[in-house]
Curated annotation (Swiss-Prot):
PROSITE patterns: HTH_LACI_1, HTH_LACI_2. It comes from Vibrio alginolyticus. This is Sucrose operon repressor. Residues 4-23 bind DNA. The lineage of its organism: Bacteria, Pseudomonadati, Pseudomonadota, Gammaproteobacteria, Vibrionales. Residues 1-56 form the HTH lacI-type domain.
Length: 94
C-alpha cells in the first residue's frame, strides 16, 4: 500500500505539498497539482480515513458482526435510536 511519502517522492515534492493537493487547499501551482495527481494515480495511493479522523479528533464506531461484515459509522452520522441498535449489535458480538 502506497504512503504519502511514496507519492511525494514520485512527484518530487514534499509530503505537505501532497497533503495540500489531496485536501484541495490553496497555494499549490496547477503544474504541481498535476504532478501530485499523476503520482497518486501511479502509486494507487488511498488516504487513510482513520488517520485523518484521528488528526481531526473525530471519532467513529467500528463493528464487525458474526458474519464478518464490518460496519463503520462516523460520529454524528446516527440518530439516538440508531446508536442504540449499534450498541445492541456490539453486545451480541461480545
Amino acid at each position: 500500500m502506497a504512503s504519502l511519502h511514496d507519492v511525494a517522492r514520485l512527484a518530487g515534492v514534499s509530503k505537505s505539498t501532497v497533503s495540500r493537493v489531496i485536501n484541495d487547499e490553496y497555494g499549490v501551482k496547477e503544474a504541481t497539482k498535476q504532478k501530485v495527481r499523476q503520482a497518486v494515480a501511479e502509486c494507487g495511493y488511498v488516504p487513510n480515513q482513520v488517520a485523518k479522523d484521528l488528526k481531526e479528533e473525530s471519532s467513529a464506531i467500528i463493528v464487525q458482526d458474526k458474519t464478518g461484515k464490518v460496519l463503520f459509522v462516523k460520529e454524528g452520522a446516527l440518530e439516538q435510536d440508531e446508536i442504540a441498535k449499534v450498541i445492541e449489535l456490539i453486545k451480541q458480538n461480545i
